[in-house]
Amino acid sequence: MVRMKGARFASLVAVGMLGFGALAACGSDSEGGGTTAPESSGSTSESGAPEVTGKVGVILPDSKTSVRWETQDRPNLEAAFKAAGLESIIQNAEGSPDTFGQLCDQMITEGVNVLIETDLDPDSGKACIDKAKNAGIAVIDYDRLTLGGGADYYVSFDNVKVGALQGQGLIDALKAKGVTKGNIAFINGAATDNNATLFKQGYEQVIKDDGSFTVVGDQTGDWDPDTAGKVFDQFYAAHPDLVGLVTANDGMAGGVIARMKAAGVEGKILVTGQDATAEGLANVLQGYQAGTVFKDTSIEAKAAADLAIAIINGEDPTTIATGSVNDSELGVDVPSVLATPVWITADTVQDVVTAGQASAADICKGIEDLCSKYGVK
């Protein structure tokens, strides 16, 4: 259950929309390596940034399930921590629970004041939270709530709303094409990801309430493009009359669209997405994807930085929270900052570029005529 504080939530969204050792040596920043903000020597840096008052560690999950973690979240987190005057260590577990645990241990040893994590699964996430809390370190779950983990705070988007946007977006796109009934299917995120459960809750309810379409397939794509593509092949073989798919993110949508191209049905069977990646936005412009959910991660990153600095300064972080999310495993409400997602169609792709979360150069490569048509620049 999500409980919201309306005024503070509206303010946050309005502002946002306007605006270690061996493992670290394994790659550059863009490849998942660590980043550390330079320390200040005085009360402010030469650029006017506040003095570094503490250290924050961030563990990102991977770079395969979505490119957003490296192309959006990392730079936005770096910028938010720098603006807050916080030293930061940002690492990527690259899908490995063992690496996740090692990074957690390293950050605790490094003496971080706050640990921010996006779990790979509940077990590895909880293990890290337990170790951090035993060391007296506050923990913020970032984007995904670790069920049963006991994090102190949670920063994300309204994930049921994300799913509702996907379901309604598919319905609207199909009806705009004159398709008022037919068979559709779901390709969900990983079963171990609480967000995937919330997304499905949103789109399943919208599809049910509309009543126009029949769900004939419902499987996980495990946040993997290849797996999602294979699931589509199964659905299409059993139901060649499919008219649409709720596909939970842009990465999986890309895998599905690749298989659709092989079958010659790209654009005939519409899919949905999430994360507003360059690939996803290009697929939207080409008519392969009904739309994508834009989650402005600069809002999410700033909220995480605001919580971290409040914790470090001994202030009350709950005053920053916009509401709470229930951890059903523990039966407790976790103070949370939840931002509002936005549905993006071909007509609004430029909004993502304007927000600085994707570049026209990346989106428009090879489809310059479509970008010109829809004003993407």
Where are these regions (language model features)?
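A residue-level marker of the well-folded mature domains of exported/periplasmic proteins
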Residues: 2-9, 13-14, 25-377
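Bacterial Sec-type N-terminal signal peptides, specifically the leucine/valine-rich hydrophobic h-region
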Residues: 20-23
